[in-house]
Structures are given as structure tokens and as C-alpha cells.
Amino acid sequence: MMDKSALGLDHLTFRFWLLGLAQAAHSIEETFTRLYDFFWVATGRLHEIVPAIAQTRMTPRTFALLNMSFIAILLGSVPFVRARKPLALGLAGIAAGIEVLNGIGHTAGAIWFRGYVPGVATAPFVFVTGVLVLRELIRDAGEVNALTPSLSRKERE
């Protein structure tokens, strides 16, 4: 029997749901602080160091569309993560990895620019929830492997 956490969800599902909520809060911060305008400055600085990275502009509409789509995908896939659908678990792992990198990126940006950058206030939340989801995915994978009987040499051949 799986341990249940708040709302009667198992730990992975609850943490993945929190990841979606953290991303929603993060997107709100980024929108209100106009990350889409700062994007030109940040990618320009990166382009100076790594010319292969293009300096990029983003309209507020494009930014909102991308963020709302990402949040909808995260929260919409919660029932499938709960059902342990392989595609949803893969998505959960990719999303968690993206959020860990997102949290690191905003924090690094604040250090690099020596001050506030859009998104840095909520960056720790997306980072931590990303780590928690990855941890649960690894733990679940270990439990599945531990419960799966190993095949004898004869059965493998």
C-alpha cells in the first residue's frame, strides 16, 4: 500500500501537483515583472559568451501562451502520473528536470546581474519541487525493480 500525503494523493502525485502550482506561481511572477522584456538582455549577455546562443525577443502574448500551455500540461497530467502511466512518468521526469534547471538559471542570473531578475523570488520553489519529484520517481523506480522478480538465466535465454 502506498503512503498517502495531503489530499489523499501518493507522494509522487502530490509533489508533481505541487510542481505545477509552483510553476504557476513562478509564471505569475515572471509575467508581472516582465521577464519577456528582460529575456532580450539575458540572452544578449549569454550570446556574448556563447555566440551560438541567439539573442531572443519574446512578445508578452507568446510568453503567456508558452507558460499557460506548460502549466496546463503539468496540471492536466496529474491524474496520469497518479495512474503511473509510463508516458506521464516520463513527462514528470522531464518537467522536474526542466524546473531544477529553471530554478538554477534564475538564481545564477540574479548572481550574474547582481540583483533581482524576473522569476528569482519563486525560483527556489520550482527548484525544490523539481528535486522532490525526481527523488520520488527514482524511489518509485527502485521499488518497482525491487518487487520485480529477477529472471533466472534459463528464463532470459
Where are these regions (language model features)?
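Juxtamembrane helix-break-helix junctions at the cytosolic face
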Residues: 72-89
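Membrane-helix boundary connector in multi-pass membrane proteins
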Residues: 85-89, 93-96, 103-121
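Perimembrane loop-to-helix junctions flanking transmembrane segments
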Residues: 40-55
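Intrinsic disorder/low-complexity segments
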Residues: 143-157
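Alpha-helical transmembrane segments of multi-pass integral membrane proteins
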Residues: 107-146
